[in-house]
Regions:
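ABC ATPase NBD coupling module
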Residues: 67-81, 95, 99, 107
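Conserved ABC ATPase "signature" region
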Residues: 114-129
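The feature captures the beta-strand-to-loop junction immediately N-terminal to the Walker
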Residues: 36-38
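Hydrophobic anchor residue at the start of the ABC signature
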Residues: 148
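A short, flexible loop at the N-terminus of ABC-type nucleotide-binding domains that lies
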Residues: 1-5, 9-22, 70-72, 94
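Conserved ABC ATPase signature
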Residues: 134-138, 142
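Helix-to-loop junction immediately C-terminal to a conserved catalytic motif
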Residues: 51
């Protein structure tokens, strides 16, 4: 099993309310699990715990059977990536995009050439002229596709999709979903989709589980 989550719970402050309560699920390679719920239900918190943004209060996460420790380090840091609802948070607003896109190469000692990066980005509909711009100069759809390309540079086996299309227009939504489906078919990446959009969950996912009050329901 690619990802196994057991008894995951989270509170943000001592003696504060539990926002995630004993959540358990598993996702295998090539599968997409949707956690579906209203705003404030705790669904984004689950995804952000898995991606290493927040520590869990209780419970454990296993990747290929190995219990993860947080903050994520070494291979696990590459193998688990996240795509945010607001893609601009992925990029430093003061840096040109070429500099932000070079960062994974530096962190993980990957061979870099500008030409190689440009060729890689073409499948995401991003071209060389985009790279000399700042994040605010791209559309939401362009920036989300670039964020996806940046995540996939790390060659992850698991991707958290935290409302990745909710801020996009219909055409951009379709482009991002198509890219995600193609990537999954090619690489057998496992996805956790966090969404309030039931129609998207039904169209895109292997299984759907509702979340209410931090508690995960049975598949629907």
């Amino acid at each position: 099993m690619l990802i196994e989550v057991q008894g995951l719970s989270k509170r943000y402050r001592p003696r504060g309310p539990m926002v995630v309560v004993e959540v358990s699920f598993s996702i295998d390679r090539g599968e997409t699990l949707a956690i579906f719920g209203d705003s404030g239900s705790g669904k984004s918190t689950i995804g952000q715990i898995l991606a290493g943004i927040y520590p869990a209060t209780a419970g454990e996460v296993r990747l290929d059977g190995q219990r993860l420790s947080y903050p994520l380090r070494g291979p696990a840091r590459r193998r688990i990536q996240i795509l945010f609802q607001h893609p601009e948070v992925t990029f430093n607003p003061k840096l040109r995009l070429i500099d932000s896109m070079r960062e994974p190469y530096r962190l993980f000692h990957l061979p870099y050439t500008r030409q190689g990066l440009c060729e890689y980005l073409e499948r995401y509909g991003i071209y060389e002229e985009h790279l000399d711009r700042f994040p605010a100069e791209l559309s939401g759809g362009e920036l989300q596709r670039l964020a996806l390309a940046r995540a996939m540079l790390m060659d992850p086996s698991f991707l958290v999709l935290d409302e990745p299309t909710s801020m996009l227009d219909v055409i951009s939504q379709a482009q991002v979903i198509q890219l995600l489906q193609e990537i999954q078919q090619e690489r057998e990446v496992g996805y956790l989709l966090i969404s309030h959009d039931r129609a998207l969950c039904e169209r895109f996912c292997t299984a759907i589980r509702p979340l209410e009050g931090g508690r995960l329901g049975e598949p629907v």
